[in-house]
Structures are given as C-alpha cells and as structure tokens.
Regions:
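ABC ATPase nucleotide-binding domains
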Residues: 72-229
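ABC ATPase nucleotide-binding domain helices that frame the ATP-binding cleft
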Residues: 43-46, 142
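Non-catalytic connector elements of ABC transporters
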Residues: 237, 249-357
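Conserved ABC transporter NBD signature motif
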Residues: 58-66
C-alpha cells in the first residue's frame, strides 16, 4: 500500500509562509503531477514528502504510516532530480548499484536488481560505460534506473526532464508513461511544463502561493478550470479571458454582452447574478474563423503563428490579444480582417472574485 495522505501541513522559511495548511490525498499506483509558477511551493512540498525538508506542523503519511520523523531512507521513496547526480568515475552499473551496496545487499541480488531495471529502461548495452559517454536522455534513464533498483513504494520526480532538449523531452515523456504502466508504482511529479502534466498524469494539482488552486484529471482542469488563475495557467496558449456584462438571467438562460454583442446561453446558475461583471473564458480552439456573414465579432490579425499542423492567430481587442486556433491550410496573413464565430457551448464564466460560476 503506497497511498499518501498530507494533512494540514505548514512550512515556514523564517517568517515566510511557503506551504499553507496544505492537505492532499494521493491514491496508490496513481501518477500525480504538481504544477504551478515558480515559488508556488511545489518542489518544497515534494522535498517534505521525501524527508529532505522538515515540516512546521501537520502530518505526512505513506501507506497509512506517519513519516514525519522518519529519515528519507526509511520512507520507502526514491527521488529523481533535474540534475542526474551520477558519479562520473563509476560505470552505469556501479551508479545504479551504489545505493544497494550501501544497504549491504548480497551481490547476487544487486546484479538481479540492476539488470532488471536496465532491461525495463533499455540500457543494458550501457552498463559498462561512464556517464560522460552517454547522452542527456541516457543519463536520465540511468538516474531513473538507480531509483527503480531500490523497489520504492513511491517515486518522486523533481522536474527530471528540464535539462533535456525538446526532442528528448518528448521521448522521455513516453518512456515515463510506459514505466508507470510497467512497475505500477505511485508517482509524484513536479513540473512547470503543462504538456508533461497533461500527458502523464492521472491527476493534476495546481498550486498557487502554497495552496491548492484546483485538482482533478487533466481534461477537467483544461475544460472546466475553477478560477481564472487555473484558466490562465493550464493550456498553451492560455484560455482567452474576455470581460463581459450580465444583463439578464432566468432559470435556464443567461444574457450577456461580450465585445459589444448580446449572447444568450443556456446555463443553470444557483445564485442570482444580475448586473454582475463577469469574465468569459474561451479556449483558442473554440473560436472559429467564419467565411460567411454568420459571425459574432471581427478583428485584424496582428500575429500569425503557423506550427505546421495548426495555426494560432492573435487578434486585436480592447482588452488585449484574443487567440484563435485554426487549420494551417487556411493561410491567414498578418493584417487580415477576420470574422469570428464563438462556440457559446464552451463558455466558461467567472465572477469578479475569479471563481467559476
């Protein structure tokens, strides 16, 4: 059993309150990613789970056992850092076996565990090489392999792919997903890369200033952010956030003015919101370029980003850029006046307190 239960944890650095009354349950065998901007506390939280940082109050339990006072080696965890932390004078085999030798494991068991991990990660041919003879991706696989040999209950990853170039990051993402399926361990992953979070995770936890802003499966966070912070953080490009005015509300419908046009949308709202300033959130893929007179708004393109498979078009608006995603074969040009149709079924509505309505 390797579930993790964090209850009312606080962490201070002098007078700075970094982690604030933080509670989180992580299911056994799940892949959970902690994301957030720099300084939000995600790496600090990971280090507290690992036992590398003390907590000021609260409890952390792994597999039903409180670990507050246990050293890292007794917590049943293994950690993989952004830095590979390999010994340059040792071979790959020796690096992977180092922790096992410290634990005085029998040589036969060491050989078995190292070779088993090497097979999983497809690095059997590199076992007698030194780290300097390996690529960045191969070195990171060795670091992960060293963690696997310990047979931990929980893997902790602290931005492990940050030092790799773009193509290697894609390759390692695939390998991490495959690894999780193979060994079926509980994994906690810290990153600022939303693509990593979206593609790897069973659950994403978005942190903001030491607190949970939202948690859930990747598609829920992407399609239904609970507040403007998550809406603007999850997704690349981020969700368009457009000020609007609510002018009428009945049991089933809302009428609002957005970019000088009235919209009536079906929305069941529990509380009365008349005359409330709201913000409409709309993903770039939910705005469409119209070739007819059936459109909601028009504006000039001032930046066109053609990515090959798709194109992002940045349009001028009184409230800043509005981004539209379209097919690359539409051949949009900078300065072109475009007619835009909104998918009102995809509107996310936020009130003036930044929370979703």
């Amino acid at each position: 059993m390797a579930d993790i239960d964090i209850k009312s944890v606080n962490k201070f650095y002098d007078k700075v309150h970094v982690i604030k009354d933080f509670s989180l349950k992580i299911k056994e065998h799940s892949f959970t990613t902690l994301v957030g901007p720099s300084g939000c506390g995600k790496s600090t939280l990971l280090r507290m789970i690992a036992g590398l940082e003390d907590i000021n109050s609260g409890t952390i339990s792994i597999g039903g056992k409180e670990v507050n006072n246990l050293p890292p080696k007794e917590r049943g965890i293994a950690m993989v850092f952004q830095s590979y932390a390999l010994y340059p004078h040792m071979t790959v085999f020796e690096n992977m076996a180092f922790g096992l030798k410290i634990e005085k494991k029998p040589q036969e068991e060491i050989d078995h565990l190292v070779n088993e991990a090497a097979k999983i990660l497809q690095i059997e041919d590199y076992l007698q090489r030194k780290p300097k003879q390996l690529s960045g991706g191969q070195r990171q696989r060795v670091a992960i392999g060293r963690a696997i040999t310990r047979k931990p209950k929980v893997f902790l990853f602290d931005e492990p792919l940050s030092n790799l170039d773009a193509s290697l990051r894609v390759q390692m993402r695939v390998e991490l997903a495959k690894l999780h399926e193979q060994i079926d361990a509980t994994m906690i992953y810290v990153t600022h890369d939303q693509t990593e979070a979206m593609t790897l995770s069973d659950e994403i936890v978005v942190l903001d200033k030491g607190r949970i802003s939202q948690q859930g499966n990747p598609l829920n966070l992407y399609n239904q952010p609970s507040n403007i912070f998550v809406a603007s953080f999850i997704g690349s490009p981020k969700m368009n956030l457009i000020p609007a005015k609510l002018i009428n509300q009945d049991k089933d419908n809302l009428e609002l003015v957005l970019l000088n046009k009235k919209f009536q949308i079906k929305q069941t709202i529990k509380k009365e919101l008349k005359d409330e300033n709201i913000t409409v959130g709309l993903r770039p893929e939910n705005l469409h370029i119209s070739e007819t007179d059936d459109f909601d708004w028009q504006s000039k393109a001032f930046v066109v980003e053609n990515l090959g498979s798709n194109t992002f078009v940045y349009l001028e608006s009184p409230n800043g850029p509005i981004i539209v995603e379209c097919e690359s074969d539409q051949n949009i040009k900078t300065g072109q006046l475009l007619k835009i149709k909104f998918d009102t079924n995809k509107f996310n509505l936020f009130n003036d307190h930044d929370s979703i309505i």
